[in-house]
């Protein structure tokens, strides 16, 4: 991005494999699942399980899933993050805007080094996680904090969350209204957020409360009553208890109770990715169809102008 500004916005998303192949997916999962913020099991016990059991099993399965949603220009998460960054640069011409991934490429630390090489004096880091969690935002904070001593002359701020930001809430609400105008409105609106182990929430992680606040802010903006919507958590991993209600069983119960159509939105995801496109838009729709119900997926804000404008306002207030 061409700008002479000494202030930079660094947009950071979770990450993605470089290709929908087993080796690339295994490399990505190995990095992701080796983060102690993500899996807290001591490495002495976790590494043999990860490399001996989990990666050999999940690598091929995940690669097959990625292949279903891969775009001509790359993974949806990478494509939309790059385009969103370009949109942010257009609405923030007085800042230098770039992007990175917490896992995979472009690597976060390398992006920070690149900004230092440009002579940037102030960096605002914007994790693309509307709701804060120790498993996501804090992991980005860890990398930034480890990098700080190498560039003490640069002021670095990490935005913690924007779960109730008025501009972001309005953008989500507008995207839902637009979807209804184009595709019609279903009987029930479902909010599906990425799950979190219950033990993490019990330890004080504010994520579930922030998800609830996000959902409530959006339904308030839409003017919906309590019977018009439902929320749940998806992407459970492992055998332990995660945040409830679980999204998919909740949808099943509603369908078996007579609800025949659902609109579903994922306000915890800034950009569409494997979890939203394969697990939800394809997977949830398939299991609901088996129960005589339909699901209409509402895309993430992705690279929309309203998304860029909302995030630019968040960054400028940092």
Curated annotation (Swiss-Prot):
Pathway: Porphyrin-containing compound metabolism; protoheme biosynthesis; protoheme from protoporphyrin-IX: step 1/1. CDD domains: Ferrochelatase_C, Ferrochelatase_N. It comes from the Bacteria. GO terms for molecular function: ferrochelatase activity; metal ion binding. InterPro entries: Ferrochelatase, Ferrochelatase_AS, Ferrochelatase_C, Ferrochelatase_N. Its main location: cytoplasm. Keywords: Cytoplasm, Heme biosynthesis, Iron, Lyase, Metal-binding, Porphyrin biosynthesis. It is found in: Cytoplasm. Fe cation binds at residues 194, 275. Its EC number is 4.98.1.1. One of its GO terms (cellular component) is cytoplasm. It catalyses: heme b + 2 H(+) = protoporphyrin IX + Fe(2+). PANTHER family: FERROCHELATASE, FERROCHELATASE, MITOCHONDRIAL. Catalyzes the ferrous insertion into protoporphyrin IX. HAMAP family: Ferrochelatase (MF_00323). Belongs to the ferrochelatase family. This is Ferrochelatase. It comes from Xanthomonas campestris pv. campestris (strain ATCC 33913 / DSM 3586 / NCPPB 528 / LMG 568 / P 25).
């Amino acid at each position: 991005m061409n700008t002479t500004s000494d202030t930079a916005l660094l947009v950071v998303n979770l990450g993605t494999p470089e290709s929908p192949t087993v080796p690339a997916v295994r490399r990505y999962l190995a990095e992701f699942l080796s983060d102690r913020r993500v899996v807290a099991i001591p490495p002495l016990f976790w590494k043999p399980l990860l490399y001996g059991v989990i990666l050999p099993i999940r690598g091929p399965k995940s690669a097959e899933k990625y292949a279903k949603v891969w775009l001509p220009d790359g993974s949806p998460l990478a494509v939309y993050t790059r385009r969103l960054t370009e949109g942010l640069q257009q609405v923030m011409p007085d800042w230098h805007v770039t992007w990175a991934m917490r896992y995979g490429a472009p690597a976060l630390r390398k992006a920070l080094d690149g900004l230092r090489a440009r002579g940037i004096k102030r960096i605002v880091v914007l994790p693309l996680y509307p709701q804060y969690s120790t498993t996501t935002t804090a992991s980005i904070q860890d990398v930034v904090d480890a990098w700080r001593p190498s560039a003490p002359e640069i002021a670095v701020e990490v935005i913690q969350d924007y779960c109730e930001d008025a501009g972001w809430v309005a953008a989500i609400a507008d995207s839902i209204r637009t979807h209804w105008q184009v595709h019609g409105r279903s009987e029930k609106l479902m909010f599906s957020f990425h799950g979190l182990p219950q033990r993490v929430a019990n330890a004080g992680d504010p994520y579930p409360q922030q998800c609830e606040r996000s959902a409530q802010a959006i339904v308030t903006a839409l003017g919906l009553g309590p019977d018009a919507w439902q929320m749940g958590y998806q992407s459970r991993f492992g055998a332990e208890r995660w945040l409830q209600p679980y999204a998919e069983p909740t949808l099943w119960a509603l369908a078996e109770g007579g609800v025949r159509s659902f609109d579903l939105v994922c306000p915890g995801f800034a950009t569409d990715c494997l979890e939203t496109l394969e697990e939800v838009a394809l997977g949830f729709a398939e299991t609901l169809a088996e129960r005589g119900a339909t699901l209409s997926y509402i895309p993430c804000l992705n690279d929309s102008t309203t998304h860029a404008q909302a995030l630019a306002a968040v960054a400028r207030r940092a």
